[in-house]
Amino acid sequence: MAARLCCQLDTSRDVLCLRPVGAESCGRPFSGPLRALPPSHPSALPTDYGAHLSLRGLPVCAFSSAGPCALRFTSARCMETTVNAPRNLPKVLHKRTLGLSAMSTTKIETYFKDCVFKDWEELGEEIRLKVFVLGGCRHKLVCTPAPCNFFTSA
């Protein structure tokens, strides 16, 4: 199974949008308004694409060239965080948060393949955007949305 996400950051609205750009599996194909676009044309995405599912309140590390300190996954039906994820995931993310060299990313990749892409690739039920919630770090949020409880390690 292989799946890719295209990330579009709208700094004017502090919104991070992720969309599928392709899939290779025996699962059901993407359909509806989120039809895959070629990965070489990220600018073809409209500025309001998926705005209703966008994430607000990004920590400052989201804008770093090195990327965010940690990732949490959420969808319309479930919440997986560094708190309730498998035991090895919080350990790896915490090490990264502290700036230490982390273990191999194989376990993280496996975790996200199993949890994040299961609905897309195997069940074919979720056609809306999947959203990665940035958090789990010592950086302050740009603005904290009321319904979201960000995990902090510091």
Curated annotation (Swiss-Prot):
PTM notes: A fraction may be phosphorylated in insect cells and HepG2 cells, a human hepatoblastoma cell line. Phosphorylated in vitro by host protein kinase C or mitogen-activated protein kinase. N-acetylated in insect cells.
Span list, region Mitochondrial targeting sequence: 68-117
Keyword Transcription attached: yes
Keyword Transcription regulation: yes
GO term, biological process aspect, one: symbiont-mediated activation of host NF-kappaB cascade
Coiled-coil region(s): none
Subcellular location: Host cytoplasm; Host nucleus; Host mitochondrion
Function per UniProt: Multifunctional protein that plays a role in silencing host antiviral defenses and promoting viral transcription. Does not seem to be essential for HBV infection. May be directly involved in development of cirrhosis and liver cancer (hepatocellular carcinoma). Most of cytosolic activities involve modulation of cytosolic calcium. The effect on apoptosis is controversial depending on the cell types in which the studies have been conducted. May induce apoptosis by localizing in mitochondria and causing loss of mitochondrial membrane potential.
Family in the record: Belongs to the orthohepadnavirus protein X family.
Protein name per UniProt: Protein X
Gene source species: Chimpanzee hepatitis B virus (isolate United Kingdom/LSH/1988)
